[in-house]
């Protein structure tokens, strides 16, 4: 188990640490706000906050994970170790950006709750996203960051064992409209029948008849 010291355990902190450490890397993570308990812990441990306690493995926080609600935040994306990163922190931190806040920002789709231009279906457009604007939309940056964190943890705590991860592939189909013919209403159905006949789309006309008439 990896023990994390933080002055405040918030739902955001608990969620993102468990996502990275447990769901992605496969190790258990615990939290404490007690300095004595942290210092007495003999196993792998790290602190997360504004300042380190001493010489422990330290990850400096941006501050977003201790806030409540949605607020506009300034983000500067930069290159780091052949990938992208944001929420930069000082060189006191073991990683030069707040990996946990950056991951939470993407996992929670934080930017979609901020004012934005919607597409024709009233949705947040991918073209408005941070990933698209900085050319990492198709890159699994959270996983990349997590496995770079794994290397750091292995170097710092050789006794910390990581299980082999088993992966499965699931196919997803994004359908803007659930049904081609059903639930269109009488008027739109009549328009569809008329359009099929006018354009001689007989197969589609017959299929529409079977679907609409049951």
Residue ranges and their predicted role:
Residues 1-214:
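Terminal accessory/targeting
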